[in-house]
Amino acid sequence: MRTSQYILATLKETPSDAEIVSHQLMLRAGMIRRVASGLYTWLPTGLRVLRKVENIVREEMNKANAIEMLMPVIQPADLWEESGRWDEFGPELMRFTDRHNRTFALGPTHEEVITDFVRKEISSYKQLPISLYQIQTKVRDERRPRFGVMRAREFTMKDAYSFHLSDECLDATYQVMHKAYCNIFERLNLDYRPVIADTGSIGGSVSHEFHVLAESGEDAIAFSDGSDYAANIEKAEALAPSEPRPAATKELKAFPTPDAKTINELKKHYGVKPHRGVKTLIVYAAPDENGVRGLVALVLRGDHDLNELKAEKHPLVDSPLEMATEADIVAAIGAKPGSLGPVGLSMPIIVDRSANILADFVAGANKDDEHYSGINWDRDVTDYEVADIRNIVEGDASPCGQGTLQIKRGIEVGHIFQLGTKYSQAMKAGVLNESGKNQIMTMGCYGIGVSRIVAAAIEQNNDQYGIIWPQPIAPFDLAIVPMNMHKSHRIPDIATNLYQGLKDAGLDVLFDDRKERPGVMFNDMELIGVPFTLVIGERNLDENKVELKNRRTGEKLMIDIDTAIDAIKAAVKG
């Protein structure tokens, strides 16, 4: 491709509304342009990268014996009503009515459509298992689209679905898909982690997320330094401390704390170390048989944070978890938040495992501006349950029993689920089994954010000059920069011959034939992240050589023109 016949569309300045590196560089490198909030046009350079990611995903899906198909973006409301998700999904589901007053949605996912297709086309156990996938545009009406294509309203996704007669068969396919995802991210040359995850609104029992590690990641992931264990911080289990609870040595004693409404203020004004105190959070209880919600107290060590997902899965706690209002707290306890504690509470108490091994600790006295010191479990508080309700912290023991946990930020780019029968049961998707009886199929679901991978790769591969693409998804393998070509008699012919020869050798080449200063050309090639640049200049031609520069390492290699094609191909593909 010659730049004179191409839309390079690079920008010198960083757009002011671009918050993260990938958004900034995708705009500056001429990969995307904003059409409206959360909506982007993919320019030629960006589309080349997107297509290369798609091709790798497609190849690995095909190797996993998944069959490609294509389903419509527009989906009828009755399928979503049948599955029960029409009301569950919320405002992110973009809905509309056509001229015939029929209601539709723009699909953020395709569980309903694929289940409807399979129940109509698959009738016998002999046709199972089967895995189907598509690479398709998805639409999600994000409340606050941001970070460019990282959180857009329209995006490209690969979604696959598998159908089985047994959980054992589902698990076997799930493992195949897990391996296929690992193969994809390894081929993309990305630093990633598969992590144990919560199933969320999709449903199901077993789930893994795939995260590309990056400081800008929205998710915190925990992984062991002694094994391959990794989990989303929301899912990672905080083990009970191995040390026993010390014996009580102090008596319960109240003391005034007019200046302390938080753990940090308790430390600042009264010298209480956060790990020697507890905080008490009041949430609404699961409704009783009459639909009435009471209150539940959640008690954690002062330096730990509540894990809402863990807490709301406790049978005593309402889901989704909701913090009690100050008015309800005062009515039930007689004190405001900031002075609450477990002593004397007349409501269910759930104590985190780490808080349960404390002795002689400090907590609110359930009286405004007052705390207790010398609190001890089973003496001052006797009726409580113990559960894991906190986020893990770096240095915690790994749940697998090997090593300690580290925490890094990650960008979720893939998510796989063992759905079970959530959708097939609701939509009556069954087949005749070996006994000739109708049996509901069990399902798996496997998603990859294709357009999100493009942004995530940039977050992990950039420097002060621009993008540093992993070779497999670079828009071009090589850029040719002929210095002052339009002022030279010999450079045009040599550059053109090398361009044609390298294309014939199977390389994706960008030939910068613009009438621009060399500095502008070099800056653009570094900005768009071409892995190798072939520099052709008069001085090197005097020695019958050209210069090959590696974008990632900065290494420069002098190559003889007579053997340039083979040498360059070996370096680029090496």
From Swiss-Prot:
Listed GO MF terms: aminoacyl-tRNA deacylase activity; ATP binding; proline-tRNA ligase activity
Subcellular location field: Cytoplasm
EC number per UniProt: 6.1.1.15
Record keywords: Aminoacyl-tRNA synthetase, ATP-binding, Cytoplasm, Ligase, Nucleotide-binding, Protein biosynthesis
GO biological process, one term: prolyl-tRNA aminoacylation
EC class of the enzyme, as a word: ligase
InterPro entries in the cross-refs: aa-tRNA-synt_IIb, aa-tRNA-synth_II, aa-tRNA-synth_II/BPL/LPL, Anticodon-bd, Anticodon-bd_dom_sf, Pro-tRNA-ligase_IIa, Pro-tRNA-synth_IIa_bac-type, Pro-tRNA-Synthase_IIa_type1
PROSITE patterns per the UniProt record, alphabetical: AA_TRNA_LIGASE_II (PS50862)
Gene Ontology annotations for the cellular component aspect, listed alphabetically: cytosol
Matches recorded under Pfam families: HGTP_anticodon (PF03129), tRNA-synt_2b (PF00587), tRNA_edit (PF04073)
Broad class of where this protein is predominantly found: cytoplasm
Transmembrane segment boundaries: none
Gene3D superfamilies from the UniProt entry: Anticodon-binding domain, Bira Bifunctional Protein, Domain 2
Catalyses which reaction(s): tRNA(Pro) + L-proline + ATP = L-prolyl-tRNA(Pro) + AMP + diphosphate
Family, per entry: Belongs to the class-II aminoacyl-tRNA synthetase family. ProS type 1 subfamily.
Recorded domain comment: Consists of three domains: the N-terminal catalytic domain, the editing domain and the C-terminal anticodon-binding domain.
Quaternary structure annotation from Swiss-Prot or TrEMBL: Homodimer.
The protein's role, per its UniProt record: Catalyzes the attachment of proline to tRNA(Pro) in a two-step reaction: proline is first activated by ATP to form Pro-AMP and then transferred to the acceptor end of tRNA(Pro). As ProRS can inadvertently accommodate and process non-cognate amino acids such as alanine and cysteine, to avoid such errors it has two additional distinct editing activities against alanine. One activity is designated as 'pretransfer' editing and involves the tRNA(Pro)-independent hydrolysis of activated Ala-AMP.
HAMAP family: Pro_tRNA_synth_type1
PANTHER family: MITOCHONDRIAL RIBOSOME PROTEIN L39/PROLYL-TRNA LIGASE FAMILY MEMBER, PROLINE--TRNA LIGASE
Name this polypeptide is given: Proline--tRNA ligase
Species of provenance: Pseudoalteromonas translucida (strain TAC 125)
Lineage: Bacteria, Pseudomonadati, Pseudomonadota, Gammaproteobacteria, Alteromonadales
